[in-house]
Amino acid sequence: AQTVRXDIPHHEXY
């Protein structure tokens, strides 16, 4: 994710 939200972490690698 390009924006750090509460739902999604900053790392999209996983």
From Swiss-Prot:
Domain of life from the UniProt record: Eukaryota
Keywords: Neurotoxin, Secreted, Toxin
Tissue-wise expression: Expressed by the venom gland.
GO molecular function: toxin activity
Keyword Secreted: yes
Record's subcellular location: Secreted
Stretch forming the signal peptide: none
Main location, first listed in the record: secreted
Record protein name field: Scolopendra 5928.03 Da toxin
Organism name: Scolopendra angulata
